[in-house]
Amino acid sequence: IEKQMQQELQTWMNRYLPFAMLSTRYYLKTLNLPPNEIRATSGLGMPEKYASLFGIQANACISYDPPCPAIHVITCADNGRLNPDLSICQKFADEHGLQFCGDMLGLGIVNLHFSETFDRYYHLWIPVRPTA
């Protein structure tokens, strides 16, 4: 990342960090792959109510994901397993006539054990639609 972008990001984090949390976008095209092949990008996520309060708008560095039907699940990750196993979510979707239809978003809700290893619990949103 270029220096100016790093400074802008640091300023943004300093201003909004109490309202934002670690966020990961897992790309739809990789969600049905084994966990070690799922591709993702991490950053900071903020609930819409806070983004609206601060007048934050989508731009080249900030994306907005509108509300949509989704499977919600809490899962855990650690040093050796950063990507979730979505097989149980896929099974649920299949049993209820649903299919994944968008990038999955994960918001970190708690971190434990900050020594050599860690456990991090995530709230995952997997956008779904009825199977055609």
Where do the protein language model's features map onto the residues?
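A solvent-exposed interaction/effector surface
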Residues: 1-132
